[in-house]
Amino acid sequence: MSHRKFSAPRHGHMGFTPKKRSRTYRGRIKAFPKDDASKPIHLTAFLGYKAGMTHIVRDVDKPGSKVNKKEVVEAVSIIETPPMVIAGVTGYIDTPQGPRALTTIWAEHLSEEARRRFYSNWAKSKKKAFTKYAKKWQDEDGKKLIEADFAKLKKYCSSIRVIAHTQMKILRRRQKKAHLVEIQINGGTIEQKVDWAREHLEKQIQVDTVFSQDEMIDTIGVTKGHGFKGVTSRWHTKKLPRKTHKGLRKVACIGAWHPSRVAFTVARAGQKGFHHRTIINNKIYRIGKSALTEEGKNNGSTEFDLTQKTINPMGGFPRYGLVNQDYVMLRGAILGPKKRLITLRKSLITQTKRVAHEKINLKWIDTSSKTGHGRFQTTAEKRAFMGKLKRDFLAEAENKA
């Protein structure tokens, strides 16, 4: 046949339209897990930064599967999650139009990296954000107003959220402006939630107090951007035959004469990537402690691999660097490029599948160089294999001289 098929299924999913750029590169939490007063008080989300990927070896615990009790190699993503600081608390009341914020109470002391978020140009600003509000915590009249706000939260609100920010100073990135996010508190009564939030103002929250090993969570973020792309790259439509006039990577028919307009369902060129997406059911394989602490100095070791090493590959993660703070290891790939802010949220659904309850037992984590084909797992292993190099002999000669 010299012509194309007369009928063909449409290309591209309409569920993600319109394919436009996200308003911000921080993943927005549009829904929180359902609250249960019988459970202990806990936060439902956390912020992290995508560092890169590696692979692991583990034993599968899945009776009935062909790979049960066998070793498998799986790809994992590393999300660096330094401790977050609670800077405020806000309460929401139920209205016919949905939840509405009643009032917000900020902490007495806000760090400079958090106050930078409220300015577009910190260097040229007067840097007076929250200076007047902080005086409320110092005089008697201001304290009465704050106590009244806390009482108002306990009396009228149906849900309580804390305002937390990341710590860019300990992350050692070029950016100095912290990221702020509202995180809902679940569990307990409203009074207990308000008291918990008040006790934790200006205090750090660790990621292992929010999530646990083997838990299924959701990742929210913005995908990698590709700019303005053609219809074949954007919608994966079939290329036209070679002899087609005026181009092959196009849609030949974009609609009938009447109605005299192009339907929104027709594939067209435009923005590709930098879309806001939510990926559900990412399983946590490990929550590692900071490599700067005694507990986490060997956070890349396992029960079977006793090598003293951190999670960092040799030379660090390409285009990211070293992961020195707490981290979360997730199964598979995560959306977005390196250094992209990733919002981690507790799952909205009740997990009933067997894969969600499988216990993960890591046997080995790859820490070879991710630039090229890495051969060695640690610097000590490479030094033992290579022996003394020329620079070592030169250094010894200089020391003797």
UniProtKB/Swiss-Prot annotation:
It is found in: Cytoplasm. InterPro entries: L3_arc_euk, Ribosomal_L3_dom_3_arc_sf, Ribosomal_uL3, Ribosomal_uL3_CS, Transl_B-barrel_sf. Pfam families: Ribosomal_L3. GO terms for biological process: translation. It comes from the Eukaryota. Residues 1-21 are annotated as: Disordered. The L3 protein is a component of the large subunit of cytoplasmic ribosomes. Belongs to the universal ribosomal protein uL3 family. This is Large ribosomal subunit protein uL3. The lineage of its organism: Eukaryota, Metazoa, Ecdysozoa, Nematoda, Chromadorea. The gene is rpl-3.
